[in-house]
């Protein structure tokens, strides 16, 4: 996709020997030659065809899917990957291919369970690229389409294949796992097989510290429901030579080093030592690895072995064999006694030989002979041949490799047997972890087989990529022609052709004993000298070069023949088959061909070829998914991206070939809305004119077609949803677009300069006008100041004159008032003196009459009480006589009866005494009150007469005053009359004072008597209560007596009938007139006592059964009533109140054993089975929480039962209540509290009640969680649509949203309105069922927290959501939620709005303008103080402005964030950028207690259905 036409100023990519590709700007164009000034500063001259266009509008953070790149070529792909790698985005799509770049550091936040939950059910490409997305897509396709799937993970060593495979298996195990109750053994074994296989099959190489030295294909089998039903692991080509040969700085397999770091007892048992002392390990200086503890890995491997089904005995045997291999490697050989013979070199070798024989559990001499000798069997005899030192060492290494290879195969088979394969499985998902293409300085047989595998897989990959392209074209219904792509079948024929292929020649050479690698190489040179993919290096006689799809690789043939031979030395087979260790013997079983002494030739290459055929057959029956792992640098360090290295891996991984296939067709594919948004400036007239300039009537495809016809572009295709462009056409459109935008920029500049000039002129004109206005204003202000002073002078003169006149008038006024005041005061004092004298006389008379009335009242009251007491005593004695007559027939209850009678007599006597005293007091009080009333009436009459006389005198005085014109002083002549009146007045005063004293004394006595009366009244009430209780007890005893008597009669009749049946028919001597005498009774005394005891036991049992049956009936009636919705009363659930009252009355809280609690728990559990009915759940949440509150109040710690004072219904009780005064407000509140206390009473609870309280608490929490989860599930579908703004027909995001009520009528906010309506619906449901506000608050707080988590995580996982227009859209939706919180009030919403703090701050950052001017401190402390640096970094790197095309934050801010993230990289928690959902229960029973009040239940009524039931009369 090289440039076809370029202009000066165009940005292009040019090749660079150091960084592969470098960008620059075209500064000169001369025909087909151009000059480009690179960003590095140098200027290069190249051909136009060598340059590639650069997309200057590409996001700085790259794109998730590289098929969305405007220019799909090598530099564009490389730049996109580097941009994403710089912001820690290590995963990128290329269509359906996932490219994974190894970050060489741990990023735990990308792989935790929360991240896994995000990808479950999400569409492929909906969230950021991730292995979880590939695994989820494979799983969904398997379930929906019923087709088995495969995921192929490839890449060179160190690219991260093993870790990626682990993630895939972890996700699939979680998706297809069983419930915890069903057991998850299969999934656990599949996951734990990884560390076991890594321990025995992985090693450190030059490129990777944990390189898999074998290929692995894991088949995970599923049943019809999509659950894992079995699994199998297939392995390919274990690198056996590594056991004996290790290059520096590589390591041998991990298990050897783990074993040397085992616990001391294991080291002692297997005679191990430091790894540096073993020959197979000390060939390399690398013994220990950073961040890897071999001792810890040993323990983890043993635990994993336990999980996968390898028992402890087998584990001991495995590590014993591994230890034997280490000791075997330390056996060195020297010259033997005979010529060309060998023997252990020294004592150390003998020690290790002996130790190896002990660990193999075989004969030491036999082991030595098998290493140093060979037995040749001929027809007539057996010949023993000695081996020289070199041959003996090769024999030793061959034994070590064979034993380790057999051990590894045994472990794989054991894992497969333990996991278990499901022959009836419907589908499977295979995960292939295969070695990538390898090309080293020295390439041997292993690299040859690995590259053959990659050739096979590349052919499969190319076919799949071509199929994807074909499916894409068919899906869009466009016309397309056949796409040519490179088929590597010729290379495969060169290698694996049956007759004449390299493998065929290799097998043929291995069958000849005298064949060498030279003869093998010569044979290949002759056979393939004309093959275009085969060549011979000039400076070598035994090497050969194959032109693979990823490049030329030169192989060295020195070890080809030895490594290809797949045989076991007969002596080794015989020796280890005879081992005393059953495990070792099982590794070397006898084979059928060994018995016949004939064996068909077998080679590693043939077997590997057959395995590849089987693998490809399996893959051909599955739908493939590809993950290409890339290693960014060879230093294995983070934050380093080597362009050349990555580009080579992309070529080797087939990614560039896939891009080339895509480029051969239509490499550029743009959705209609994106295409129009970018190129509508080329032909704006093809769009219908509307309010915003975008088409309304025409469709997008028609608009795109008109635009392309307008620009006269050829070869394009219009699909159903996309525009398909040929290679180079995108660059052509961009060039034309740049021209249009350039002309538009010129016009904008012209308009802007005109605007600046006009603005300057208007400013000057405005300044001149302002100066004139200031001058004119100053003159006007001076004139106005003179006028204001003249007016002020006149105002001051008027005020002074007014003040003098007012002062003169006030002096005259106060003099007149003073004179009148003196005259009126003297007259008033005279009247006051006369009124005081009259009042004193009246008071004396009233007190006298009051005293007489009280005496008369007390006498009457005393007589009435005496009469009542005598009558009640008579009734009590009559009742007592009845009770005595009723109790005479039963002797068992005489003691209780006599005791009760005594108590009744004593209490009756006390009651009579109290009543007499009370009657006397009432009579005297009544008499006194009557006397006082009569005296009061007389005094009132006198007062009226006196008042009339006084009024007459006053009127006469007024008339005299009117007749006398002048007031004159009249001397008093009648002094005697004055003295007489004065003396009488003094006598009256003394009489009044004495009466006052008597009255005070009488009042004190009355108060004392009142107190005594109240105390006695209380005692009388208590006595009456006791009498009522005793009467009730006597009544119950009478009922029991009647029952017992009836049962006795029945039993007597039965016994008499039985006795008559056994007696002889002859008459009995002792009978007289049908009766027996006491001495001659038919039954003796012991029989009568036994019969009586039996009768008592039977009656007790019947009584208990009767009570139990009654109790069951009552409990059943209660449950049948409350199981239905019986509504609410006083805002509280009737069912909870009724249950509590019944439990309290039945004393269930104090019972040691009762079934009522179990039945209530079962009833509640069955009532809430319908988890989706919020109305029903809310009703039971209200009932259970209310019942829990009432029980919580009753079962408070340290609570003691209180006796409830019974309400007296007797005549005396009603009279006593009538004498009490009306209650005040304080008494009213106290009465309410007392009534509430009567409803909820503290009790001493037993274990069943405490257990019921715990179960009830659990049900409250469960129902709360069910309602909360229902609301979350309802909102989750809407939240996925609320995070991204809907687009118009041309793809432009809706930008302007209004707040308040108009938003709910706006169609773009339909999904937000759905959330708004859903919240209102659940709120009304909870309110209608009177759920406590504290629970409603917590439901909405957790729901808003869930909304915050979902929206915020979606924002960070989907780049298309981090836009300016989308921020405005989400902000408008959040305004709706804020409006809901304000309307709901804090009582129900609580702090719900604060739970949206993360998404609010993130959206606030997205919609703020001029982000490039904001510093990091402003962002972290002012704009987004709650967000972490990882979250800020992700938002800043993903953000792009789709409305105004402005920049994000500056590069300095990004650099600061990177530094802070690097400092926190060791902290796993701090590196996570996603939020975790909180599903805990945020309240306790104490919270309910604090939110509800006891007095709310004071006036509640029980269920109406139970009021008609006599057994529940206590509820009324």
From Swiss-Prot:
Record-level Gene Ontology MF annotations: actin binding; ATP binding; calmodulin binding; cytoskeletal motor activity
Coiled-coil ranges per UniProt: 890-1056
GO biological process: actin filament organization; actin filament-based movement
Pfam families: DIL, IQ, Myosin_head, Myosin_N
Myosin motor domain mapped to chain residues: 61-738
Region (Actin-binding): 494-528, 530-553, 588-612, 612-634
Keywords: Actin-binding, ATP-binding, Calmodulin-binding, Coiled coil, Motor protein, Myosin, Nucleotide-binding, Repeat
Sequence segments annotated as region (Disordered): 1061-1085
Compositional bias segments (type: Polar residues): 1069-1084
Domain notes: IQ domain mediates interaction with calmodulin. The tail domain is a globular cargo-binding domain.
UniProt function note: Myosin heavy chain that is required for the cell cycle-regulated transport of various organelles and proteins for their segregation. Functions by binding with its tail domain to receptor proteins on organelles and exerting force with its N-terminal motor domain against actin filaments, thereby transporting its cargo along polarized actin cables.
Protein name: Myosin-14
Organism: Arabidopsis thaliana (Mouse-ear cress)
């Amino acid at each position: 996709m090289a440039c076809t036409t370029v202009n000066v100023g165009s940005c292009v990519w040019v090749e660079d020997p150091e960084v592969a590709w470098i960008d620059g700007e075209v500064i000169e164009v001369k025909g087909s030659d151009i000059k480009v000034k690179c960003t590095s500063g140098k200027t290069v001259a190249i051909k136009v065809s060598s340059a590639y266009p650069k997309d200057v509008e590409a996001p700085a953070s790259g794109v998730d899917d590289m098929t969305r790149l405007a220019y799909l070529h090598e530099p564009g792909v490389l730049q996109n990957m580097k941009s994403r790698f710089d912001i820690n985005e290590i995963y990128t799509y290329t269509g359906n291919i996932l490219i994974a770049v190894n970050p060489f550091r741990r990023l735990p936040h990308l792989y935790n369970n929360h991240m896994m939950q995000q990808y479950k059910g999400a569409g492929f490409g909906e969230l950021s690229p991730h292995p979880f997305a590939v695994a989820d897509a494979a799983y969904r396709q398997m379930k929906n389409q019923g087709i088995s799937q495969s995921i192929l993970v490839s890449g060179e060593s160190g690219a991260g294949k093993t870790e990626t495979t682990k993630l895939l298996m972890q996700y699939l195990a979680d998706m297809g796992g069983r419930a915890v109750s069903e057991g998850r053994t299969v999934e656990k074994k599949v996951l734990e097989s990884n560390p076991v296989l890594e321990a025995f099959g992985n090693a450190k190489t030059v490129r990777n510290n944990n390189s898999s030295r074998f290929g692995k294909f894991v088949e995970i089998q599923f049943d019809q429901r999509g659950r894992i039903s079995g699994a199998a692991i297939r392995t390919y080509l274990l690198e056996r030579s590594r056991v004996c040969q290790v290059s520096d700085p590589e390591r041998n397999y991990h298990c050897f080093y783990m074993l040397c770091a085992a616990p001391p007892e294991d080291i002692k048992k297997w005679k191990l030592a430091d790894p540096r002392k073993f020959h197979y390990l000390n060939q390399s200086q690398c013994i220990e690895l950073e961040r890897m503890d071999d001792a810890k890995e040993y323990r983890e491997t043993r635990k994993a072995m336990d999980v996968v089904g390898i028992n402890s005995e087998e584990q001991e045997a495995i590590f014993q064999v591994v230890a034997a291999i280490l000791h075997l490697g330390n056996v060195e050989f020297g010259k033997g006694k005979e010529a060309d013979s060998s023997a252990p070199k020294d004592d150390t070798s003998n020690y290790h030989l002996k130790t190896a024989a002990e660990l193999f559990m075989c004969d030491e001499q036999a082991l030595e002979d098998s290493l140093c000798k060979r037995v040749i069997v001929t027809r007539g005899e057996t010949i023993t041949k000695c081996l020289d030192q070199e041959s003996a060492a090769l024999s030793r290494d061959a034994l070590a490799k064979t034993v380790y290879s057999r051990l590894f195969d045994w472990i794989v088979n054991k894992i497969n047997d333990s996991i278990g394969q499901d022959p009836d499985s419907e589908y499977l998902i295979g995960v292939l972890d295969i070695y990538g293409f390898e090309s080293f300085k020295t390439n041997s047989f292993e690299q040859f087989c690995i590259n053959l595998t990659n050739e096979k897989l590349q052919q499969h990959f190319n076919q799949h990529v071509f199929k994807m392209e074909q499916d894409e074209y068919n899906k869009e219904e466009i016309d397309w022609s056949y796409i040519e792509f490179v088929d590597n079948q010729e290379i495969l024929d060169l290698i694996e052709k049956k007759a004449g292929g390299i493998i065929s020649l290799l097998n043929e050479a291995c069958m000849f004993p005298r064949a060498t690698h030279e003869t093998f190489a010569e044979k290949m040179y002759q056979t393939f000298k004309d093959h275009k993919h085969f060549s011979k290096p000039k400076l070598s006689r035994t090497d050969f070069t194959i032109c693979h799809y990823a490049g030329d690789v030169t192989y060295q043939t020195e070890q080809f023949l030895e490594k290809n031979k797949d045989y076991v030395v007969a002596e080794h087979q015989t020796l280890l088959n005879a081992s005393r260790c059953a495990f070792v013997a099982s590794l070397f079983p006898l084979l059928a061909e060994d018995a016949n002494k004939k064996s068909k030739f077998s080679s590693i290459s043939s077997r590997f070829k057959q395995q590849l055929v089987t693998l490809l057959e399996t893959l051909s029956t599955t739908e493939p998914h590809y993950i290409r792992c890339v290693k960014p640098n060879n230093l294995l360090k983070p934050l380093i991206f080597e362009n050349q290295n990555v580009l080579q891996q992309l070529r080797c991984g087939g990614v560039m070939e896939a891009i080339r296939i895509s480029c051969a067709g239509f490499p550029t594919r743009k959705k209609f809305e994106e295409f129009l948004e970018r190129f509508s400036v080329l032909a704006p007239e093809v769009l219908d004119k509307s309010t915003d300039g975008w088409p309304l009537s025409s469709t997008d495809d028609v608009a795109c077609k008109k635009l392309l016809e307008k620009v006269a572009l050829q070869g394009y295709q219009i699909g159903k949803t996309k525009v398909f462009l040929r290679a180079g056409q995108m660059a052509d459109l961009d060039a034309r677009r740049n021209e249009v935008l350039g002309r538009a920029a010129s016009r904008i500049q012209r308009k802007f300069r005109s605007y600046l000039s006009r603005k300057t002129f208007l400013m000057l004109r405005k300044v001149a006008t302002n100066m004139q206005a200031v001058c004119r204003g100053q003159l006007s202000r001076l004139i106005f100041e003179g006028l204001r002073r003249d007016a002020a002078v006149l105002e001051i003169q008027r005020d002074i004159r007014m003040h003098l006149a007012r002062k003169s008038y006030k002096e005259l006024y106060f003099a007149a008032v003073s004179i009148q005041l003196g005259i009126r005061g003297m007259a008033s004092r005279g009247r006051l003196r006369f009124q005081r004298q009259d009042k004193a006389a009246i008071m004396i008379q009233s007190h006298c009459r009051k005293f007489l009335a009280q005496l008369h009242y007390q006498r009457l009251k005393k007589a009435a009480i005496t009469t009542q007491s005598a009558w009640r005593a008579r009734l009590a004695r009559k009742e007592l006589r009845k009770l005595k007559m009723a109790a005479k027939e039963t002797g068992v209850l005489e003691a209780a009866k006599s005791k009760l009678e005594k108590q009744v007599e004593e209490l009756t006597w006390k009651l009579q005494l109290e009543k007499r005293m009370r009657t006397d007091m009432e009579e005297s009080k009544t008499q006194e009150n009557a006397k006082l009333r009569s005296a009061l009436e007389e005094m009132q009459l006198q007062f009226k007469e006196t008042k009339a006389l006084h009024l007459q005198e006053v009127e006469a005085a007024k008339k005299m005053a009117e007749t006398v014109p002048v007031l004159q002083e009249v001397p008093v002549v009648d002094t005697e009359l004055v003295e007489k009146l004065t003396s009488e007045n003094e006598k009256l005063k003394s009489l009044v004072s004495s009466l006052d004293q008597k009255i005070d004394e009488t009042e004190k006595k009355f108060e004392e008597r009142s107190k005594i009366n109240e105390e006695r009244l209380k005692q009388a009430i208590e006595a009456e209560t006791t009498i009522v209780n005793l009467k009730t007890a006597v009544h119950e005893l009478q009922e029991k007596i009647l029952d017992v008597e009836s049962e006795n009669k029945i039993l007597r009749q039965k016994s008499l009938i039985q006795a008559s049946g056994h007696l002889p028919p002859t008459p009995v001597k002792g009978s007289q007139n049908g009766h027996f005498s006491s001495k001659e009774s038919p039954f003796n005394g012991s029989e009568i006592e036994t019969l009586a005891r039996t009768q008592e036991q039977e009656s007790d049992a019947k009584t208990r059964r009767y009570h139990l049956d009654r109790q069951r009936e009552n409990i059943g009636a209660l449950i049948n009533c409350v199981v239905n919705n019986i509504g609410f009363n006083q805002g509280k659930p009737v069912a909870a109140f009724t249950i509590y009252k019944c439990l309290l009355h039945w004393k269930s809280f104090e019972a040691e054993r009762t079934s009522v609690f179990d039945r209530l728990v079962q009833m509640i559990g069955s009532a809430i089975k319908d988890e989706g009915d919020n109305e029903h759940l809310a009703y039971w949440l209200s009932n259970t929480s209310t019942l829990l509150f009432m029980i919580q109040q009753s079962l408070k710690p340290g609570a003691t039962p209180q006796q409830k004072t019974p309400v007296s219904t007797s005549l005396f009780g009603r009279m006593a209540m009538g004498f009490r005064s009306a209650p005040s407000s304080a008494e009213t509140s106290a009465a309410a509290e007392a009534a509430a206390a009567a409803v909820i009473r503290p009790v001493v609870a037993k274990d069943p009640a405490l257990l019921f309280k715990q179960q009830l608490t659990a049900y409250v929490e469960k129902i709360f969680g069910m309602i909360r989860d229902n609301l979350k599930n309802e909102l989750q579908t809407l939240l996925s649509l609320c995070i991204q703004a809907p687009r118009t027909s041309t793809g432009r995001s809706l930008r302007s949203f209004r707040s308040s009520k108009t938003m709910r009528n706006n169609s773009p906010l339909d999904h937000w309105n759905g959330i708004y309506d859903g919240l209102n619906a659940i709120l009304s449901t909870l309110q209608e069922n009177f759920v406590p506000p504290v629970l409603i608050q917590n439901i909405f707080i957790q729901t808003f927290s869930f909304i915050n988590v979902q929206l915020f995580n979606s924002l960070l996982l989907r780049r298309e959501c981090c836009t300016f227009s989308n921020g405005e859209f989400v902000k408008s939706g959040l305004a709706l939620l804020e409006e809901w919180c304000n309307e709901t009030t804090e009582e129900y919403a609580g702090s719900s709005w604060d739970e949206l703090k993360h998404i609010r701050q993130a959206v606030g950052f997205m919609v703020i303008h001029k982000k490039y001017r904001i510093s990091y401190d402003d962002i972290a402390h002012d704009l987004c103080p709650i967000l972490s640096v990882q979250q800020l970094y992700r938002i800043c790197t993903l953000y792009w402005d789709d409305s105004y095309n402005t920049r994000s934050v500056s590069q300095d801010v990004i650099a600061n964030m990177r530094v802070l993230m690097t400092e926190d990289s060791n902290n796993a928690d701090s590196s996570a950028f996603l939020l975790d959902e909180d599903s805990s229960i945020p309240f306790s029973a104490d919270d309910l207690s604090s939110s509800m009040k006891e007095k709310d239940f004071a006036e509640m009524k029980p269920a109406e259905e139970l009021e008609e039931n006599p057994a529940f009369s206590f509820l009324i």
